[in-house]
A protein has these predicted regions:
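Peripheral, non-AAA+ core regions of ATP-driven protein-machinery
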Residues: 1-218, 225, 331, 471-472, ...
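Basic, amphipathic alpha-helical bundle interface domains used for macromolecular binding and assembly
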Residues: 39-44, 59, 66-76, 289-290, ...
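Short loop/turn elements that form and flank the Walker-type P-loop nucleotide-binding site
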Residues: 26, 58-61, 98-99, 131, ...
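P-loop NTPase nucleotide-binding/switch module
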Residues: 170-209, 213, 240-295
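Walker A/P-loop
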Residues: 219-260, 325
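Residues immediately C-terminal
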Residues: 110, 303-304, 310-311, 397
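Walker B catalytic acidic pair
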Residues: 300, 306-307, 318
Length: 512
């Protein structure tokens, strides 16, 4: 008997329906075709054991299984469940008429229990688009899939539950998630707050500007000056996720298997902080069977690179194109996939190998050549992509005393959100543009025109600091954000002066 069950394959962050055709006839052979990988071919043994433990027998017939379309590679063990159900239906131990209503995914253990799988959210979205009545998934994945409206999601623990449900001998209750209620309830819960940081008001101001305009940022300073502490509090002043942003980001983390068990939607912007030994592929994504990298996992959030010069130079250079395009294309012989990469880059570094160049109290042990060599580990074009460059200094005791109060993240976030609201209104007619950092050259000429005094100041700065055309654009974008923070429709000289101050690596002559 020929029957069909349905699953899906994930490519990039979208899914494609996989039709599993099972034909059971007289004979004793087992064939699995349709470009399955090793893990899929090994499902034969898992299915036999799972069915036996659950009280069912694997059919002693000639079984031919085709996973269509055949040009898409099927990877992983997530097809175990639809394969097993299809085999039972083809052997006439199940009513095959109900299989067409449901999509199924799940890895089988030898005892018949189901293990969670990756990529459930994009698969659930595809199941709804294709008109399936329900989606049967491991219980741990149910809440993640249930955020998709107009689709009944059934979380199950064993294959026996699925068999009895398809046979009509068991009722399963769909998993229900109040997406909006859960999303908004946990949106503003942060472990770290800017009130924890004493002093460093100029750096906090720079972080506020970066958050308001989604500008890339680098902090340069000696060890122990608070660079990492400040950077890790940046998510607490970013505007909260919109529901659409949360769905986009959750899809990426779902594909990468980074969603926590029994989790529905991500409620806070991601903060990714990879180690400096990371490889090119782990950073931008790829591999023989492409997976999203750190830049995509940081989509709609922050990618924090601590000790920037310690990263392999090739790793830093491959980030330049995604920083500009806000997407990354991974091409392989059989397919090409696109991953979103709209992240805010935040980096930190010491000013020299020993960390104490220009320190007021501790002597630097590095030669001028060593300092220059250290700084040159980060290329000029990459630094041009970093809008705000700030020197973090060691603070005296008076400034870090716990007796001094410090502004909390909530107060800063309110100002940031007001500036972002101005930008959203400004760019409402421009699809894909939401912040000042995303402005094109055309939009710069329209919305970031300084007054006469500001233009004169900028001309002098360009000449004295020998700034590139790219740095010129960055200064204008940051100036536009500074004006938005003051709700000023015009960019004035004071805004440009502050923006120029945030080009520390252009203003300083390191190692001389």
């Amino acid at each position: 008997m020929l029957v069909k069950s349905y699953a899906a394959a994930v490519q990039g962050i979208s899914a494609t329906v996989i039709t599993i055709e099972v034909n059971c006839t007289k004979g004793i052979q087992f064939f699995l075709v349709g470009l399955p990988d090793v893990a899929v071919r090994e499902s034969h043994e898992r299915i036999i054991s799972a069915l036996q433990v659950s009280g069912y027998k694997f059919p002693r017939n000639r079984i031919v299984i085709n996973m269509a379309p055949a040009d898409i590679r099927k990877e992983g063990s997530s097809y175990d469940l639809p394969l097993a159900i299809g085999i039972l239906a083809a052997a006439e131990e199940l009513d095959a008429s109900r299989l067409g209503h449901y999509m199924m995914m799940g890895e089988l253990s030898l005892d018949g229990s189901l293990k969670p799988v990756k990529g459930i959210l994009p698969i659930a979205i595809k199941a709804r688009e294709e008109g399936f009545k329900g989606f049967i998934v491991p219980k741990q994945n149910a809440r993640e899939a249930a955020v998709v409206n107009d689709l009944d999601v059934y979380g199950v623990s064993t294959i026996k539950e699925v068999i009895e449900f398809i046979a009509g001998r068991r009722d399963l209750e769909p998993t229900v998630v109040n997406t909006r209620e859960e999303f908004y309830a946990r949106q503003l819960q942060f472990e770290a707050d800017f009130s924890d940081v004493r002093g460093q008001e100029n750096v906090k101001r720079a972080l506020e500007v970066a958050a308001a305009g989604s500008h890339n940022l680098i902090l340069i300073g000696p060890p122990g000056s608070g660079k990492s502490m400040l950077a890790k509090r940046l998510p607490s002043i970013l505007p909260p996720f919109t529901l659409q942003e949360s769905l986009e980001t959750t899809k990426i983390h779902s594909v990468a298997g980074k969603i926590g068990l029994d989790t529905s939607l991500m409620t806070q912007r991601p903060f990714r902080s990879p180690h400096h030994t990371i490889s090119n592929v782990a950073m931008v994504g790829g591999g023989a069977f492409p997976q999203p990298g750190e830049i995509s996992l940081a989509h709609n959030g922050i990618l924090f690179l601590d000790e920037l010069p310690e990263f392999n130079r090739s790793v830093l250079e491959v980030m330049r194109q995604p920083l500009e395009d806000r997407t990354i294309t991974v091409s392989r012989a059989r397919l090409s996939v696109d991953y979103p990469a709209n992240f805010m880059l935040v980096a930190s570094m010491n000013p020299c190998p020993c960390g104490y160049y220009n320190h007021p109290d501790r002597p630097c042990l590095c030669s001028p050549g060593a300092v220059q060599k250290y700084m040159n580990r980060v290329s000029g074009p990459l630094l041009d992509c970093i809008y705000i460059q700030v020197v973090v200094v060691q603070l005296p005791f008076e400034n870090i005393s716990y007796g001094r109060s410090s502004e909390c993240s909530e107060a800063i976030r309110e100002r940031v959100m007001k500036a972002r609201a101005i930008q959203e209104k400004r760019f409402a007619a421009h699809e894909g543009i939401y912040s000042n950092a995303q402005m094109t050259s055309k939009l710069l000429h329209e919305y970031a025109v300084p007054d006469a005094a500001g233009l004169s100041l900028l001309k002098v700065a360009m000449q004295r600091l020998n700034l590139s055309a790219r740095a010129y654009d960055r200064i204008l974008k940051v100036s536009r954000t500074l004006a938005d923070l003051e709700a000023s429709p015009n960019i004035e000289a004071c805004h440009l002066a502050e923006a120029i101050q945030y080009r520390s690596l252009d203003r300083e002559t390191w190692g001389t």
